[in-house]
């Protein structure tokens, strides 16, 4: 990874800040960058030191299948299901809600690449589920000078790099190669849920950040925004493993016909179902790929007894 400008870590003595000052200034910068997203990501935040009185789950602890299963089981209780397949998919979605926006926005708006590997994060759970993240060690942080506009000297933030491609590769590797991939593998092992479904959930949450940032602050749809989004979701291949990228195309646009007006409307749907319709609460996510077939989904969700009762009533009235 090539360096830009001064040798990484070198600054005249009078320009140096203490580690505490750097952490405080950087945390404030990262929190401020999240401001446009508060309408959708109300609880999301990023910490560089643990707050008092909040449960912090060490990311590395989730590599233990029993510990991970316990977290997934408890999350299933929150959403009303004992099915570990559904609980696993939506626990991953909740983790994505907490983890992805802070890391992605640091990359896109500030040119800062934070090491979000599972071993380097803590997951803050003020209400028993992932809400914020904490970066344990900043020593692996990298910075793209052309995107950075903070008040701290760049060399005290991290190692300068010379290309946006290097920045994206670093972030992709940490987030998806060293965090979500091992979690997906373990959840698949104990629940049997398809990795494709889990990757679909993670990719949707990752792309949701870009869409929300554009809706909340259209002026932030910069070249960096477009390049980063395309690199994450429009490449068929990735270099983290063999085979096609599981992040490719998290959504698709389809035409639907309004049953009352007969007008065609475009609608953005998930490419992969998240399984939430199987939870016995009668709900579907707003971007459900099964939404155009809502009646079919309702029938699938009905119990065998309800279907038999419906057929019996129909026979009597025939």
Feature locations, PLM:
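Generic N-terminal leader/targeting and pre-domain segments
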Residues: 1-92
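Cys/His-clustered metal-coordination modules, chiefly Zn-binding fingers
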Residues: 224-318
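Aromatic-residue detector
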Residues: 37, 55, 107, 133, ...
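Hydrophobic, aromatic-lined core segments that form the binding pocket/scaffold
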Residues: 66-264
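Serine/threonine-rich low-complexity intrinsically disordered regions
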Residues: 7-12, 18-25, 30, 57-58, ...
């Amino acid at each position: 990874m090539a360096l830009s400008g001064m040798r990484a870590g070198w600054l005249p003595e009078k320009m140096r800040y203490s580690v505490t000052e750097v952490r405080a200034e950087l945390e404030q910068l990262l929190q401020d960058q999240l401001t446009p997203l508060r309408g959708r990501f109300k609880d999301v935040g990023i910490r560089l030191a643990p707050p008092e009185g909040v449960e912090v789950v060490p990311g590395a602890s989730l590599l233990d299948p029993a510990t991970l299963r316990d977290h997934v089981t408890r999350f299933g209780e929150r959403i009303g299901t004992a099915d570990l397949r559904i609980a696993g998919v939506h626990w991953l979605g909740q983790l994505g809600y907490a983890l992805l926006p802070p890391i992605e926005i640091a990359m896109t708006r500030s040119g800062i690449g934070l090491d979000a590997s599972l071993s380097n994060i803590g997951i803050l759970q003020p209400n028993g589920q992932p809400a914020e993240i904490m970066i344990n060690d900043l020593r692996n942080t990298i910075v793209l000078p052309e995107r950075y506009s903070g008040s701290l000297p760049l060399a005290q933030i991290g190692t300068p790099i010379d290309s946006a491609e290097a920045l994206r590769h670093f972030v992709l590797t940490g987030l998806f190669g060293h965090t979500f991939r091992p979690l997906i593998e373990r959840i698949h092992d104990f629940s049997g849920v398809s990795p494709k479904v889990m990757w679909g959930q993670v990719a949707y949450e990752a792309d949701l950040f870009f869409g929300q940032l554009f809706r909340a602050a259209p002026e932030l749809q910069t070249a960096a925004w477009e390049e980063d989004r395309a690199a994450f979701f429009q490449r068929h291949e990735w270099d983290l493993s063999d085979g096609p990228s599981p992040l490719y195309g998290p959504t698709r646009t389809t035409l639907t016909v309004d049953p009352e007006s007969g007008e065609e409307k475009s609608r953005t749907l998930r490419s992969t179902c998240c399984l939430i319709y199987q939870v016995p609460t009668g709900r579907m996510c707003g971007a459900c790929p099964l939404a155009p077939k809502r009646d079919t989904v309702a029938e699938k969700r009905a119990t065998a007894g309800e279907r038999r009762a419906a057929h019996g009533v129909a026979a009597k009235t025939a």
